Amino acid sequence: MNSKCVLLLLAFTAVLTLTACSGSKNTCTTNCTTSDAIVNVTLFDTPPTGLTVLSYSLPIVGISLTPSTGTPVSIYSPTTIVPTELTRLQAESALIAMDVQVPAGTYTAINVTLATSGGIFINESTTVLNTTCGVGNVCPLAGGAATTVTIPMKLTLNSGQASWIGLDVNLNNAITMPTSTTVAADFTQANTFAATTTPRTGTPSNAFDTIGDFIGTVTALTNSSITVQNTITGQSLTAALNSGTQFDAAPSSYSNCANGGSCIAKGSVVSMDATLTTSSTLTATEIDVLDAAATDEVEGVIYPTGPLTATPVVVGMILADKISTGDNTTLGAVTTTFGTGIFLAANTSINYVIDEKNLTNSITPVGFAGSGDLLAGQQIRAHVTNVTSGTSGISATATNVLLRWSRISGSINSFAGNNFTMTGLPQYIATLNSTLIQPAAVFTYQNGTLFDGVTGTGDPNFAVGKPVAIRALFLNSNAPPFQAAKVRVP
């Protein structure tokens, strides 16, 4: 791919002031009564097809419920804009509101107010799009204008009872092509949002939903709870710790942590998995220590900008997460956010390791030992230095590289035992990774892989042709290339 095209990577950036927002509890503080009901809201994304979107930032600035009589009741109204990155939600859920008290009664619709949004896509067509986006280029996706979307639903909230609303955003349905050479996103299109109140099959008992791979810095820690704050969004989540919470750590050569339970502290950088319980609380199921102490670092999906035999190798990264210790103004800027493009230089002599997370005791993965194992579509995390902004965009030098979890969608092609194969992968993954055997093989692990929407590969709904999304290690190996920590079948 022509690296010059990444000039167009300059991220869509809403003018945001990002401060902590704890999953917006919005708990009632005045005029509250014992007759109030409790509402929780999460957001997830239908596995995408069609246009390959590498990043999409959707700022939700308000949510209300329409009662059968009377005026709408607000259940989410953040004081600052908290953007949600949609592409990761093809396999995950994001917590929007928790433990919100609202009047008991019957409601007929949920209203979602959006600020201006936008993203980054790959032009996999055979023609120039949007005047300047050449074939094979990575380009900005014109976003949807600020709007309010009303989703009809029947909802009865009972006094003292906790309820859950799952918002399913369908980015496919929001993508429009007004002409054969233009593409944009419009969230007023039909069937862009749907709402459900029934937890998906595979959700743990006594839980409404699961929150996966929430990354941030530990801001508070006790024997019974942990608070983690994401750098880009400012969102803070506080979760209970109990005897069932699993502590892991990325390899010590990356994390400087030999054992997750012993080195985690305030200031550590972690990935947290949690359940949103039917008691309207979060319980941490896994804490994966990425860094015992914070250091400048970036994470995102990558693609090659030149040969992997070059010294150093330079890959393009679409930013999905960052940690800034404050010494670098480019990395710390609020404009360095979801979708920002970074040219990442990585020498062959540095450390390349794998974040095995909850599969630590199940596998010894191979296929990520050096710069020659960098593949288009992988999600990597890297300690960085020399982060600078110039005429060609942002560049950085990687000093330590960690393979993390790609979110990839396709269709179930075949299955046998715990394994299955996928077709319909994003075109750039198939095109740019010449060694990838297709249909691509996915390995799942008993008592390791979380299934969402199905109970496992033996579930009747796990069928050939069904859409599927995975959170998986993407290895430069065909035995098999995808090691799945999570599988979602809508």
What residues fall within each predicted segment?
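Bacterial N-terminal signal peptides that target proteins for export
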Residues: 1-8
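Hydrophobic helical h-region of N-terminal Sec-dependent signal peptides
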Residues: 8-15
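C-terminal motif of bacterial Sec signal peptides marking the signal peptidase cleavage site
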Residues: 17-20
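A short, solvent-exposed, low-complexity linear motif enriched for acidic/polar residues
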Residues: 22-308, 320, 325, 332, ...
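Short, acidic Ser/Thr/Gly-rich low-complexity loop/linker segments typical of extracellular
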Residues: 240-241, 343-345, 437, 444-446
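Glycine- and charge-enriched low-complexity intrinsically disordered segments
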Residues: 313-315, 319, 424
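Intrinsically disordered, low-complexity segments enriched in Gly and acidic/Ser/Thr residues
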Residues: 406-454
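Extracellular low-complexity, Gly/Ser/Thr-rich intrinsically disordered linkers
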Residues: 420, 424-426, 443, 461-474
